[in-house]
C-alpha cells in the first residue's frame, strides 16, 4: 500500500548549499523530517549545478516522517539575470530599461525550463519567458 502523505513543503534552496538554518530547518522541522538527511541528499543531487543558483524543491513528507523530493529548474527571472549578467531587474520596468534579451537567449532559457513549464511548443514557452523579461525591465528583441 502507498504511504500516507502528511504534507508538501515547497522551498527555494541554493544549489549545493542546503543547511539546517532558515528556511530549510524550520520548514522541515515542523514536519518532523530529519533535516540533515534532506540537506545531504539535496546537496548531492544539485552538485552538478552552479553553486548558489536558487533551485525550487517540492518535498513530500509522509506520515512515517520519511520524505521524497523533486527539484525543479531555476526561476526564469534568475536565468534571465544570469544570461545578461545583471544584478537585478528594473525597479520601474515601464520606464527604466536595464538590458536587452535576444530571441536566441529566450530560446535557450525556454529549453532549459521546458520540463517545468506548461505550453505546447517551445515558442509558447519563449513568449512566457519574454513576458517575465518585460516585467523585469528588459527589452525583448523581435
From Swiss-Prot:
GO biological process: one example: translation
One Gene Ontology cellular component: cytosolic large ribosomal subunit
InterPro entries for this protein: Ribosomal_uL11, Ribosomal_uL11_bac-typ, Ribosomal_uL11_C, Ribosomal_uL11_C_sf, Ribosomal_uL11_N, Ribosomal_uL11_N_sf
Pfam families for this protein: Ribosomal_L11, Ribosomal_L11_N
Record's keyword terms, sorted: Methylation, Ribonucleoprotein, Ribosomal protein, RNA-binding, rRNA-binding
Molecular-function annotations in GO: large ribosomal subunit rRNA binding; structural constituent of ribosome
PTM entry text: One or more lysine residues are methylated.
Keyword Ribonucleoprotein in record: yes
Function (record text): Forms part of the ribosomal stalk which helps the ribosome interact with GTP-bound translation factors.
Quaternary structure and partners: Part of the ribosomal stalk of the 50S ribosomal subunit. Interacts with L10 and the large rRNA to form the base of the stalk. L10 forms an elongated spine to which L12 dimers bind in a sequential fashion forming a multimeric L10(L12)X complex.
Sequence similarity: Belongs to the universal ribosomal protein uL11 family.
Protein name: Large ribosomal subunit protein uL11
Gene behind this protein: rplK
Amino acid at each position: 500500500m502507498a504511504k500516507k502523505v502528511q504534507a508538501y513543503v515547497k522551498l527555494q534552496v541554493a544549489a549545493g548549499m542546503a543547511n539546517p538554518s532558515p528556511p530549510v530547518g524550520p520548514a522541515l522541522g515542523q514536519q518532523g523530517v530529519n533535516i540533515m538527511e534532506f540537506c545531504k541528499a539535496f546537496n548531492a543531487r544539485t552538485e552538478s549545478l552552479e553553486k548558489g543558483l536558487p533551485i525550487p524543491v517540492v518535498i513530500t513528507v509522509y506520515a512515517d516522517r520519511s520524505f521524497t523530493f523533486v527539484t525543479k529548474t531555476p526561476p526564469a527571472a534568475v536565468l534571465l539575470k544570469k544570461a545578461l549578467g545583471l544584478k537585478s531587474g528594473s525597479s520601474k520596468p515601464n520606464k527604466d530599461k536595464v538590458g536587452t534579451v535576444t530571441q536566441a537567449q529566450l530560446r535557450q532559457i525556454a529549453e532549459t525550463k521546458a520540463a517545468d513549464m506548461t505550453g505546447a511548443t517551445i515558442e509558447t514557452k519563449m513568449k512566457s519567458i519574454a513576458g517575465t523579461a518585460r516585467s523585469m525591465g528588459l527589452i525583448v528583441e523581435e
